[in-house]
Amino acid sequence: LGNGAYSSLHETRARYYQDNRFADVFADVTRAPRALLAEIAEIEGVLDAEARIVKLGLLDLEGMKDPGSVLFVSLPGGAGLNRLYLREGRLPDPLSAEEIVIADGFAKAHGLGPGDRLAVLMNGKRRELLITGVALSPEFIYALGPGQMMPDPRRFGVVWAPRAGLEAAYDLDGACSNLVLKLAP
């Protein structure tokens, strides 16, 4: 019975990662031209490559004694790697600089959902963003903020936003700060 349960859990996890196109390689960079992606995609063994913007922002929520932060991750234009599973709402309009999707655990910890606004500091500027959806991601099953040993969804959350808005907020027009790759088996 124990081996059967383990095998079932192992297969379920593998299928979840496969269905949601979980990346094999994650690389942070300070700033790289997005045009570099074409060269990376040509490397032998790379099945798919995606250039993203991944940046920290600070939470500006009433009632929080200790500072909190969010990790902004740009949404891919197409099917993309590390697909989101929407629990509520919808994905942001790709042309919007104000719409976001937030991680499920973070949403529950703060009682937030579609239609609510989230106040954050992005690159030193305060912004109020409209939550359009709540999602799960294979990349952030356990979301750990800077210096955290254990997940604390009250103090750290993941926020997905359209690329254009993050490019403007973090002065990364035509650039990326993170690369993810799917490799051939």
Give the role of each language-model region:
Residues L1-P185:
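Membrane transport/envelope proteins' first extracytoplasmic loop
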